[in-house]
Design a protein with these regions (language model features):
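Flavin (FAD/FMN)-binding glycine-rich loop and adjacent Rossmann-like elements that form
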Residues: 1-163
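N-terminal propeptides
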Residues: 162-186
Length: 186
């Protein structure tokens, strides 16, 4: 389709990646795929300097990530090691799950609205699971209250997630059974 219908005849499957006759992996797996154009697009800059950014996305956190950027360039050793900035623990903002131009849809997993670089930190299972929990909770609140997901106030979603003992801010030294957990997570 991409080559014939869209006219990108120069695009195709890499023939030097997997060593198979058809160029496909032995087992199907998507490390990266299409990502949402969301209300918010989380970038490496947002995470590396979360408190110094004017957007203050950390205030709209609905899940937590704690993994460095890891991009693999095994096919192109000439690129060498890329010095990505260290990534502190971070919050994933609510807007990455909400499409910019579509109502009544919530996206989670690896398709959230993130840049290619920070995708290396958000694609891990702990982030995917927490974001999935937030997406399901957001959809349930919207359905129960008769509104679209984008109309649900972030504080309403955060309160529901905190009632489920979810982490929405990267404060790992305060456990859910701590009396101050919910207050510190806000």
């Amino acid at each position: 389709y991409i080559q014939h219908e869209l006219g990108f005849s120069h695009l195709g499957i890499a023939d030097d990646e997997f060593g198979t006759a058809d160029g496909l992996a032995y087992l199907p797996y998507h490390r990266e795929g299409r990502r949402l154009d969301g209300v918010i697009r989380l970038t490496l800059d947002d995470v590396a300097d979360r408190y110094g950014r004017p957007s203050a996305l950390y205030r709209t956190g609905i899940s937590v990530g704690d993994y460095p950027v890891d991009h693999h360039h095994d096919c192109r050793p000439q690129i060498g090691k890329i010095p990505f900035p260290p990534v502190p623990s971070f919050s994933v903002p609510m807007g990455v799950m909400i499409p910019a131009g579509t109502d009544n849809l919530v996206v989670s997993d690896k398709a959230i609205s993130v840049s290619n670089l920070i995708n290396g930190s958000t694609r891990l299972q702990p982030v995917v699971l927490l974001t999935g929990q937030a997406a399901g909770t957001l959809a349930a609140i919207a359905a129960r209250e008769g509104c679209t997901p984008r109309e649900v106030p972030v504080r309403r979603l955060q309160a529901a997630l905190l009632a489920q003992d979810a982490y929405i801010a990267p404060l790992y030294d305060v456990k859910p059974d701590d009396p101050d957990f919910a207050m510190l997570q806000r």
